[in-house]
């Protein structure tokens, strides 16, 4: 009788959790140049599971992304594996790896190359997006010092990442970012950079008292992005 009562309580609590999740509101942070196509499918599947839930998608801060989680500004975020030291108050779940690519104008003399080494960028300009160090160091890319050592001009600065993309499209600068090998970026080409290993992309939420809807969103993301983890051609060049 005691076991049956305990089972009933657990069933009632689970039913209540599902009802609460369906009426919930979650905020998801998203990074620049992310895989928007797969992400939209994740949101669509989540909304199908919880049709009355509200999902807000906001840009993540490259300077202090972990603080957005801790302060409650976002419920779920995406991170590069090098952005944290396994902070115990946050639960990180690895999703897939992203290889580094050089973004450039299609008319650049390097645009026809199948892959590049950092030394190949000698004499080229690489634009910073205001928080340049933060954006690149977060994903283990080349530092300003490493770029300067091979003769890259790092003097061009844009106040926003969008402004940096415009400069790339104009052909006045390049940029180095992690992105999927099959990603299409309008108005520019991307060439794999061979000098750096892929960086791991993780999804994260606060570890304490995880809500059912947050857990469900993360499980959907793990399943959707699982195909990348088993297909290295999406994140690294095949030469």
Feature locations, PLM:
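Central regulatory/effector-binding core of bacterial HTH transcription factors
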Residues: 23-84, 158
